């Protein structure tokens, strides 16, 4: 019987699944398999959704539930390295039952199958790294842009999680905002309590809270000025893709913030590659190329031998589930060789 590893990416509204053949390394799901998360209804409700969604996904792709020998799970942070949700959880985990909830342990108990855990940024970073380098020795740093800014550091195919599981929380690294002329000296606030970190400029939250209001003052007749802030922030990307001047300027500001962060990392780690992913980059190849050029322009000039390699994390929203599956496969292989 074939041995299958499941990858589960828990988001705020949806759970993404993938299935990986442990013997061949082939993914059985080419794109996304989704199931409603219902995370705002509490931990136990969401846990049931995860289990039910996995059963439905396995059935859809002709996989016997008993063939699933390991599961990889990722969630938004902050959480411990073992999958215990922090009291300062993400906006997806606002129900009173979430703080301190052992999601990994609870899922393992429900399934009766070993479950490994990764932060969602680390999971996507692992998939991006392995897609680019495979088993070759290399170091990569990833930025995953969504509601916030996640990411990960991967060294020779291993995620650097850190002592408490907070390794790769790149969004909360401070950057020199004064080097971004469009900000006019402003150091925007972040939900974490810091001012002027990367996430405070480069995230959907940053667009809604800081950048869109700032640029609408400069473009008072822009159509987005008459749209509710939350909805308007989500429409900035489509306007920018069509070449809208104001929205391109917003994305350029975000790119320059990320470029400044990458510059700091280059001087600290000199990685083999930077990878960028998340919903913000699910755009046309032309817009991706423009935005990567803007990120590079935001980096102060480097020595020629330090010229950074910038890449897009493949497979879009499926990246997290795929990275979680790879982590579970590695855990299974390590246990077998111990």
Predicted regions and their residues:
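A mobile "lid/hinge" subdomain adjacent to the ATP/sugar-phosphate binding pocket shared
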Residues: 188, 194-273, 308
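Glycine-rich phosphate-binding loop of actin/hexokinase-like ATP-binding domains
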Residues: 133-201
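Short glycine-rich, Thr/Ser-proximal phosphate-binding strand/loop in the N-terminal lobe
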Residues: 2-48, 86-90, 165, 175
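Glycine-rich phosphate-binding loop and adjoining helix at the ATP-binding site
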Residues: 44-48, 67-70, 77-139, 184, ...
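Glycine-rich phosphate-binding loops at beta-strand->alpha-helix junctions
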Residues: 14-15, 265, 269-295
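Glycine-rich phosphate-binding/hydrolytic loop that grips phosphoryl groups
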Residues: 7, 116-130, 282-338
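N-terminal phosphate-binding loop and adjacent alpha-helix
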Residues: 27-67, 96-98, 242-245
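Phosphate/pyrophosphate-binding loops at sites that engage ATP/ADP/AMP, CoA/4′-phosphopantetheine
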Residues: 50-71, 114-115, 262-274
């Amino acid at each position: 019987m074939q041995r299958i590893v499941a990858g589960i990416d828990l988001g705020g509204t949806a759970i993404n699944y993938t299935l990986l053949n442990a013997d061949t390394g082939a993914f059985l799901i080419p794109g996304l398999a989704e199931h409603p998360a219902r995370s705002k209804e509490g931990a136990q409700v969401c846990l049931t959704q995860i289990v039910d969604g996995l059963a439905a996904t396995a059935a859809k792709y002709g996989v016997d539930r008993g063939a699933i020998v390991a599961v990889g799970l990722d969630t938004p942070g902050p959480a411990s390295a073992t999958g215990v949700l922090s009291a300062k959880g993400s906006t997806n985990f606002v129900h009173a039952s979430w703080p301190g909830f052992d999601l990994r342990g609870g899922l393992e108990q429900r399934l009766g199958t070993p479950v490994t855990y990764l932060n969602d940024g680390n999971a996507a970073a692992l998939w991006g790294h392995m897609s680019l380098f495979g088993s070759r020795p290399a170091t990569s740093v990833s930025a995953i842009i969504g509601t916030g800014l996640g990411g990960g550091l991967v060294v020779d195919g291993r995620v650097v999680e850190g002592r408490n599981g907070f390794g790769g929380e790149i969004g909360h690294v401070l950057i020199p905002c004064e080097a971004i002329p469009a900000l006019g000296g402003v150091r925007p606030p972040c939900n974490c309590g810091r001012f002027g970190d990367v996430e405070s400029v480069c995230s959907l939250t940053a667009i809604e809270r800081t950048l869109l209001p700032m640029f609408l003052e400069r473009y008072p007749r822009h159509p987005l000025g008459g749209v509710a802030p939350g909805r308007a922030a989500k429409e900035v990307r489509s306007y920018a893709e069509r070449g809208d001047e104001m929205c391109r300027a917003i994305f350029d500001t975000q790119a320059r913030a990320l470029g400044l962060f990458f510059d700091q990392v280059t001087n600290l780690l000199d990685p083999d590659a930077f990878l960028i992913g998340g919903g913000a980059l699910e755009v046309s190849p032309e817009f991706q190329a423009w935005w990567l050029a803007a990120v590079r322009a935001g980096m102060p000039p480097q020595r020629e031998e330090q010229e950074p390699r910038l890449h897009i994390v493949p497979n879009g929203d499926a990246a997290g589930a795929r990275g979680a599956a790879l982590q579970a496969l590695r855990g299974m292989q390590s246990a077998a060789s111990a």
